[in-house]
Amino acid sequence: MHSDPGPWHPLLCFLVLALSTSANSDVTPRFTSKPLSTVQKPGGPVTLLCSAEPPWAHISWLFNGEQFERISSQGVDIQSGHLVIPSLGPAHVGQYQCIASTSVGAILSKSVSVSVAYLNDFETTTGHSVTAEEGSSAFIGCKIPESNPKAHVRYKVRGKWLKESSDKYLILPSGNLHILNVSVEDRGTYRCAAYNPVTHDLKLSTSTLKLSVNRSPRVDSRILHPVTSQAVLVQIHDPLTLECVVGGGPSHPPVYWYKGGQEAAAYGRRKLLHTHLVIEQVQRSDAGNYSCVLGNGSGISQRVYYTVIVLEPPSVSQKTEDQSLTAGSNVRFSCESRGNPTPNITWFHNAVQIHASTRHQISGNKIRITSLFAQDSGIYQCFVNNEAGSAQVSQRATVHLKWSKPVIVSPPTSIRVANGDLVTLTCNATGIPTPTIRWYDSHGPISSHPSQVLRSKSRKALLSKIGTPGQDPVHYTMSQAGSSSLYIRAITVQHAGTYKCEATNEFGSAHADAYLTVVPYEMSTKPEDITPLDLTQSDEGDYDSETRVPDHSQINEHKPEPRVTEKPYSGASLPEAPIILSPPQTTKPDMYNLMWRSGKDGGLPINAYFVRYRKLDDDGNMVGNWNSIRVPASENEFPLTELEPSSLYEVLMVARNAAGEGQPAMLTFRTSKERTSSSKNTQAPFPPIGVPKQTIIHGVSNTNNGLVPVDPSRHSGVPEAPDRPTISTASETSVYVTWIPRANGGSPITSFKVEYKRTGGHWNAAAENIPPSKLSVEVSNLEPGGLYKFRVIAINNYGESRRSTVSRPYQVAGYSIRLPNPLIVGPRIDQTEAVTDTQILLKWTYIPENNNNTPIQGFYIYYRPTDSDNDSDYKRDMVEGTKLRHLISHLQPETSYDIKMQCFNERGASDYSNVMMCETKARRSPGASEYPVLDLSTPSVPDRSSSPSHSPTRNGDFLYVIVGCVLGGMVLILLAFIAMCLLKNRQQTLMQKFEPPGYLYQGADLNGQIIEYTTLPGTSRINGSVHTGFMGNGNINNGCPHLHHKVHNRASEVGNGELYPGCNSSLKETYVDYDRLPHHLSNGRVMYTALPQADPTECINCRNCCNNNRCFTKPNGSYCGNGVAVMPVGFSPQQEEGETKPLNHVMVPMCLTSPDQNCSEEIEEDQNEKETQLSANSVCPEEATQTGTEQHEGEDCTKTEDDSSILTWTPLILPAISKDCDEKHVWTSTDITLDKSNVDHPQLQTQEA
């Protein structure tokens, strides 16, 4: 039985993992796989592989020495670990290099070439014949066309293809054919062909060769091939054949090969193949001059020479070491290499070529860098290359700005803890180079190993060992560069004292002290005495705030806790782990109800439970810090709140009695997704199982009421299945299997077991009886190229747990055949939403890393009605690319569907995803409004947000429609208002245009006749100007309905008098009085009166124009000479109802006399009227206006005019009149034609617009 690792074992494992990861972050990158040169046919795919260690190294590519980011990379797909050219073209041909970068620096791989395969045509030749003697050798020559890669030569011999050499026919490396022991059957035609193994092109020579066989007498032997000396280039370790074809008689003299005057075939690696010299593996010593000698009895008859040049790829012989340098110093690097021909040397710094400069001095195979800066830190590479290949060696250099002694920036703090608690002291220091930190106590340096504290000790055992010499150490250290933490578990009074942190580097040291105070245990167990005992350490070494639940039973009863000395520990032990009853998934996204029942108390009552929980990622790695909660012993459930939706959490729970803390119970659970109103059907969460708050009685059955039951192993005492194991490479034939344990079922885990199986095989045990302190094991002796899966089993006193989830398939290196289906893990469906009665919106997440970043071409979406059990009912939609949403259409209304997915590429499809159910909406009634369907296309870059929208999309669109309609209506109203204002302004402008301040009556002869009109009190203007009227030189007929604007409150009277006696014609003042005439208010605020219409025949010589109540005459009209008395117009005394105001009397003078009249009249003011202002439009400024209005009496009308529908209005332009009326004046006018529709109205009323 293995000793128990204790409740802090998971924490220790995570600390070791975190520290090892941090320590490896400063690792020099190195390539684990490098790209290889490739020849491909035009349009074919090309894949260049490149991987490096550490795994987080960044991979980039160079093309012909330029970064792909700086040049056009069209048609090239760069992904993690490989570069893919889907269709090879001329633009892709060139040299490629791979760069691996980390925080330390960057390294550059050797240059590889990507070229296009081709095969040229044979040169055009004419056919010829070859004659050979029977029994001798024949030589058939073939000039192979240029090809990439080198073409394979074939021969068509008498209608049959010869692809490889045989006993009789030798196809030489040069492509020529050597026929041995020629016979008559060998006669016929021969034709050579070239075959390209990449493009699979086969091209025939343009001519054929005819072989003739002679049975002639013996002839002299001769060398048929070659006929001239040859130079041959061969790479070291390649095979070489030096050709020498001898023809002649059936038997020829022997053939000898010499090298440097010595027989060449005497050497073991050099052999004769008929008359050819074959060297199996060329070495450097095989270079030199060779000769093929044909001899006869009389001496040497013929020979041919070969010069062999052995090409040797460069190699670097020296070993390099990392260098630590100081800023401002100098450094020298050398590169010892060899090769044939002599290699060229190129230096690179962090994958950038170094050119000679004042600071970089390059001489031969050495480089010297002076006055180093911090930027000179990194990786230096020496590249050597020649015609045979290339090689490189790298060396890391670190440049420190300045050296400095250590400085402790975060010293340990003195603390006061309870007996038996866990203590953490932390110390951080800086310095150049980074200092090393060690701890000291009163006994000296502390150097315990973590493995010594993996055994759990009870508090009783620890207390009983106080003062006992040779006790096991209970403290250990975890250190990395510049930082260290000292952990002391189950502290006792003996550990109290001073602890010193010492930081040391090459230039000095520094130290800081902290004092540790240990208080008795009974002081810490009282509810009112809270100490750091209940705090738990986070993975970063900091303490988190804790949440406490008051123990009401202890507070109310005030029962004192028993002291350690009050009760003997005989027969008592630590409590067993609580039995957690909660399901592994909660129905709420932000809360988990933790429920449990107590295990055996160990003979002492349980004082409290301690719950610690933290967040994990989907791979089981820690994300958040530990949160600690103290729960009273009387409780058996507690809600964990403020959790994140769709997240994985780990819970560690222990019970404490007077003897100490017992074994921990572990659990992992996942919170549910955050519900949204837009998703009607989501994946059903794992239902909870109701557990009463009272302690559960053993042996009582509990029904699930149709709910999914919890894993029965959780109540049987066996541990929970560990998490899915992760696999990492250990060597070419071994792997590391790592896992995370879960709840122990109430009994400590005693061991683990790892099983494995190969694809298509059975499960076998890889390792058994693994101590609980080990969470990783190496599995070796795996077959190269095999595909394996692994699983883990936890074991305690109750038995074995269920098998863990099977690991992802792992392929051992060395397997050359491509996998039939590299896509293993499919996408995960996140959300389904019924958009309409026939459409469902599907959203999913795909993680390329789950399939080793294997490229995919798209997704398959399968759906069928939920009530169907036939897989053939599934329909499939295909989504190309890397979209993460799709709209499934043409569905049945109000029908539930099962939906699942796969990802695929050209080699197959992945496993199925999770299955989701979603029901379409009910069918809409006819005429119901339908919201527009949104564009559901998304970019290729995935959005992995786990929180869906909280409001339906269509409501937002409807709101936009309403807002748009309101804004549109407001704009239309504003435009209408602007149009009305513009129209009103135009009318007023036209009004002012045709109503000048002074209205001029037109006629052939106009005298200075005065037309008098009345305005409201205080005003004498119409439309802002004094209005003046002019009458013609004639009489007004009795019935002429003209307005003369004489309205005042005086009594009616008729009077005539001469106003201007100096003129030939006198102007008479005339008044016309009518009772109760209608009055109108013009827009110039002038009260006027309209006269009743008389017989139109009496107005034949006068025309009315309804324009501000003034009467105009036609320009060609004349007035009568008879004087007509006009009654003054006034208000009747019976004018009641409204209040009437007196109207002002306004007189407008005008002097329009004949030329012989003197116009120097004076204007007297009426004594009974108020003085009024002279009109600004008076032609004679010297004249004044008299009270009243005179009407000129003229002769009878002698001229009539017909009633026309067109009225011509000619405004006068009057020149200034001099004081003497002797000179002639000319008036000009402009005709304006108006419609006369209003003139013929039966009752004339003048109205202003």
UniProtKB/Swiss-Prot annotation:
Q: Where is the Ig-like C2-type domain?
A: 29-113, 120-212, 217-307, 314-400, 406-517
Q: How does it sit in the membrane?
A: Single-pass membrane protein
Low complexity composition bias: which ranges?
937-952
Location within or outside the cell: Cell membrane
Q: Which GO terms describe its biological process?
A: cell-cell adhesion; nervous system development
List the signal peptide residues: 1-25
Topology Extracellular: residue spans: 26-957
> Which residue windows does the record flag with biased composition (Acidic residues)?
1159-1168
Annotated ranges, domain Fibronectin type-III: 577-675, 721-815, 826-923
Query: Per its UniProt record, what InterPro entries does this chain match?
Result: FN3_dom, FN3_sf, Ig-like_dom, Ig-like_dom_sf, Ig-like_fold, Ig_I-set, Ig_sub, Ig_sub2
Major place of residence: membrane
Q: Where is the composition biased (Basic and acidic residues)?
A: 545-566, 1190-1202
The cysteines joined by S-S bonds are: C50-C98, C142-C192, C244-C292, C335-C382, C427-C501
Q: Where is the composition biased (Polar residues)?
A: 1173-1189
Q: Which residues are glycosylated?
A: N181, N289, N296, N344, N428, N870
- Transcription regulation as a keyword of this entry, yes or no, is no
Alphabetical list of PROSITE patterns matching this protein? FN3 (PS50853), IG_LIKE (PS50835)
Q: What does this protein do?
A: Component of a cell-surface receptor complex that mediates cell-cell interactions between muscle precursor cells. Promotes differentiation of myogenic cells.
* Record protein name field: Cell adhesion molecule-related/down-regulated by oncogenes
What is the organism of origin for this protein?
Xenopus laevis (African clawed frog)
Q: What is the lineage of its organism?
A: Eukaryota, Metazoa, Chordata, Craniata, Vertebrata
